[in-house]
Amino acid sequence: MCGMSYRQRFEDRHAQAITEAIEQLRGRASAAKTWTEYAAMYPPPKLASETDVLQYAASLERGAAVADTKMVAKLHDPALRTLFARIGGVEAMHWALLRSTLGEPPIPDSFLPAD
């Protein structure tokens, strides 16, 4: 449980920083989704083992790292670009740690995937 609360703090801080950045630009952030809504958007496969859970978590972290990297390319505001680059770097580290835990090369390629 400690690992989940630790990870949740990261995600909460990321969401808070993004919300604050949007509000500083006089925008309005979308409402936070519940865990049930997220599960519906990213349904987990059958999680029958610890390996299944780690692989699913790794796929989510990879997806987050890729999404944040794509946001950097789309944004014009330097502060927002920096924010998404910093968050994406953390997500990539999470992905690498999960891959390493699975016995896979932590960094499988010279570049973060584009998809």
Locate each region found by the language model.
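All-alpha RGS (Regulator of G-protein Signaling) helical domain and cognate RGS-like helical scaffolds
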Residues: 1-115
